[in-house]
Design a protein with these regions (language model features):
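Amphipathic alpha-helical segments
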Residues: 1-5
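A structure-centric signal for secondary-structure junctions around beta-strands
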Residues: 6, 52, 90-92
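A non-catalytic, amphipathic alpha-helix used as a structural packing/dimerization or gating element
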Residues: 123-131
């Protein structure tokens, strides 16, 4: 990943997945900010789900955390950490996501998480990391 300040990474990190997978309302930053996202649960199908999250913690250039207020999960807590890191003598920013979630729906949710949800989320976050690297590379 190209070297970048936490400020630049934080600004770009708020970019949602590209349509048609997901869209996000314009976002301000700070505690209490509500983020509304529309996304396809199954990308091959036209059905969209709405996800409402609220930022509960925020420290500029260091981290922010959000919780789901309404959406596909029984429980969702997500923390985005922006950590200064030096590699090969170049200082940049490492983005680290910590996610604690519960699918719900009892045993069926456990099965769905094992077969689909976890892999889909891993793919979404891997795509976000790739997009972040691409967008930052365009800045340099």
């Amino acid at each position: 990943m190209p070297p970048a300040s936490a400020t630049k990474v934080l600004a770009i990190h708020r970019v949602p997945p590209p349509p048609p997978t997901g869209t996000t309302n314009d976002q301000a930053a700070g505690v209490g900010t509500t983020i509304v996202t529309s996304f396809r649960v199954f990308p091959a199908l036209p059905f969209r789900a709405r996800w409402i999250a609220r930022i509960t913690e925020f420290e500029w250039n260091h981290f922010f955390a959000d919780v789901q207020e309404k959406g596909p999960f029984k429980d969702w807590h997500h923390r985005h950490d922006f950590l200064a890191q030096t590699r090969d003598g170049v200082t940049g920013t490492l983005v680290h996501d910590v996610i604690d979630y519960e699918v719900g729906f009892g045993f069926a949710g456990v099965i769905a998480n094992s077969l689909l949800v976890r892999r889909q989320m891993e793919g979404t976050f891997a795509e976000r990391q790739q997009r972040l690297a691409q967008l930052l590379a365009q800045q340099y």
